[in-house]
Amino acid sequence: MSSYANHQALAGLTLGKSTDYRDTYDASLLQGVPRSLNRDPLGLKADNLPFHGTDIWTLYELSWLNAKGLPQVAVGHVELDYTSVNLIESKSFKLYLNSFNQTRFNNWDEVRQTLERDLSTCAQGKVSVALYRLDELEGQPIGHFNGTCIDDQDITIDNDEFTTDYLENATSGEKVVEETLVSHLLKSNCLITHQPDWGSIQIQYRGRQIDREKLLRYLVSFRHHNEFHEQCVERIFNDLLRFCQPEKLSVYARYTRRGGLDINPWRSNNDFVPSTTRLVRQ
């Protein structure tokens, strides 16, 4: 269990509780979770973070009414900046989006502006929103993470409790390498409900070579770890930076969707540009 799982800042969340679904617009349904909850225990300070990045959300179940009452549908792309005070809690995001279903808007841009305003207010940070018509995305190929997959290793896992022990002495030699490693075995659990969160992760770095077996064991140790997606990515970045001390590091995870939403956080200390094409499990 995370050290802050019972923090009072989480007590008011609708997550894990029975809730009524509203189909008329209500911005108050959105709920934020302070990023400081997991950053403070990691020693990360808002004014001196070792990374930049965004939380990329894809909205697959977005619908509203036009001015004449005709339903509209779109796929939304949201980017929430890492400097925001709060992350957006996903169940509240889903409930908020449902509140658009029977609400009339004059045009698509009004919907986009409403989303940007409300999400920015909840997160207390910078948010950008793009809406796509379905025909704009038809035929879009399934993407993949570039890099070397480290999953096919003949190893025995006898401990799947989270630990950073595997990263101790995980680098060898003085030779500097630059490589991209990928795993599809990332699985953590929701901080509140403990429901499973499934993801793929891409790690780009420049530095002393990281032992792939130790890295895989570390990633697998998240299997019973309870944190939100964004928190897990920041923990992984921080742990790799602390124990492996790469010159450059980027960590990007794309999680499978739940409730019509997928969350894809990335953190980097260099000029990393993430691919936003959905992966095969998304």
From Swiss-Prot:
Q: Which GO terms describe its biological process?
A: queuosine biosynthetic process; tRNA modification
Q: Entry's InterPro entries?
A: GTP-CH-I_C/QueF, NADPH_dep_7-cyano-7-deazaG_red, QueF, QueF_N, QueF_type2
Spell out the coiled coil positions from the record. Answer: none
Annotated disulfide bonds = none
Would the keyword RNA-binding turn up in this protein's UniProt record? no
Where does the source fall among the domains of life?
Answer: Bacteria
Pathway in which the depicted protein is active: tRNA modification; tRNA-queuosine biosynthesis
Any one GO CC term of this protein is: cytoplasm
Assembly state and interactors?
Homodimer.
Name of the protein = NADPH-dependent 7-cyano-7-deazaguanine reductase
Which lineage is the organism of this entry classified under, starting from the top rank?
Bacteria, Pseudomonadati, Pseudomonadota, Gammaproteobacteria, Enterobacterales
